[in-house]
Structures are given as C-alpha cells and as structure tokens.
Amino acid sequence: MTSAGARFSNTVLANYGGQKSFHRIAGAGPVTRHVGVGHPLFAGLQLGERRSCNMASLFLDLTNFTARTFWDDPEEVTLLAHSVLCAFAQVVTELGGHVLGLRGDGLFAGFGPVANPEVSVAIASIAGATAIDAIQNDLNPKLKFRGIEPIQARGGADFGETFFVRSGSFEASEVNVIGFAPNFAAKCEKAAASWEFVVGERFASYIVDETLLETHPGSPKKYQRDYETKTYGFSKYRWAKSLKWVDSTIDELRGLPLEELVI
C-alpha cells in the first residue's frame, strides 16, 4: 500500500462526507469561478486553430457503475462518482499530468509533451497503477466499514501524436482532443476488466521491462480500408509491479507538470 493510496482514499471520503450538505437546487446561491480542465499549452487556441504534441493519454473509470446508477439513490451515486473523480484528478496532477476531460464516472488525462517518450509512458503507468490500487486496497475497505458498497476501477492508455483544436462557435467552444492515441487509449480502457490496466502497442513499446506486459486475449485490433488490413496490438499492464515507484515519483515531481521538467 502506498502513501498516495491513503491520500486518494482521504480525498474521496472527505468529498463524500463534506458534500452531503452542499446540495443546492440549480440556480440557487452565488456563482463561483472554477478552473476548467485542459492542457495549459493549448488553452489559448482560437476557434478552429489546432496544434499537436506527442503525449501519453490515460483513461480511468469505474466499472459496472451504470448498474449502480440504476439501483441506488441518484444523489448518493452522483456524490460518490464526484468524490472518486476528485481523487483521480489529484493523482494526475500530483504526477505532473493534466486532466483533459471528466465524463460521468471517468477521467481522461494527458502526460507530456516531453523529449523522452519513456518518461510520459512511465508516469502515466504509475498514475493508472496508483488509482486502481488505491481503490482496490485502501478505499474499498474503508467504504465497506462505512456500509457503502465497494467500487471497481479500470484503466487504459496509449501514446502518440495528439491534436488539440478549439471547436464549437464564437458563443460556446472548447478545446477538443483528437488523435489515434487518445482514441485507442479509450478503447483500451473499455477492453479492460475490473482492476485491469490495458495499454496500446505504441505505449507498450516504451515500457523497458517487458515482464510488466501480458498480451491481451483480444489483441490485435484489425483495421481494414479498401483492400488493405493493418493490425495494432494491446496488452495488459501488470500495474502492481510499479507500485514501488509511486511515492518516490510523486515526491520527486512535487506536482510540477512534466513538460516543465528538465531531463
């Protein structure tokens, strides 16, 4: 168990307990300003403007959560998802990444760009391992103790060129993230079972220790256009083996964005 795992659980429980009295009807109360998600290098893009970088994309979400939204009290489910997303975001920022999107019970994050792809991949791997381990081995026992049904998590990641483009209208727009790497990372996350972390072929190619990888039974993915067929593999990442690096890596980074590191 890691110190980061304990912080993760504390963040979830603090938000879950502290927000119970914060329910308001929409439109009531003062409007407060909050910092939005996104990558600071691309926040200033104009409508239609696009730029790209090589980056590790990471997706984390809660498995079997749709069934929970069906059976359980809607406000309780919302509060639990919110609390876990807060902890997901904390892990990402502690490890120098950027939260690029929050949807329902899942998070999309980016790590980089940095000159050495192995750095982005290693840190994204540690972030995924930290979150999954924290839920399984630290948070869930504490939820059970409080009479709350445990949750399950999974992750997916890949690496490659990623485009940022501001899309929408002059009245309402946001920076959209597009590319094969983030798209395939999302597919990896969907291919993962509970407690699994699945990574794409290019991401896996930057993992030095091959014993950390196990070929996924559904690999490779086939892509066909006209008369040409190509394949792209994906693997299970043995995330438990990387937990030994979590606390020291967080201490070393101290929340500094990876792109600001001098390596």
Residue ranges and their predicted role:
Residues 1-41, 194-263:
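Intrinsically disordered, glycine/charged-rich C-terminal tails and inter-domain linkers
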Residues 44-123:
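Catalytic NTP-binding/metal-coordinating core of nucleotidyl cyclase/transferase enzymes
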Residues 84-90, 130-135, 184-190:
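Substrate-engagement module of ASCE P-loop NTPases
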Residues 89, 93, 136-140, 144, ...:
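A general structural signal for alpha-helical elements within enzymatic catalytic domains
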Residues 95-120, 140-178:
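Catalytic core of nucleotidyl cyclases, primarily class III adenylyl/guanylyl cyclases
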Residues 123, 127, 177-180:
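Short acidic-hydrophobic sequence patches enriched in Asp/Glu that either
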Residues 125, 129, 133-145, 258:
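Acidic, metal/cofactor-coordinating or nucleic-acid-engaging core segments within structured domains
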Residues 149-215:
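Active-site/pore-lining binding-face segments in mid-to-C-terminal subdomains
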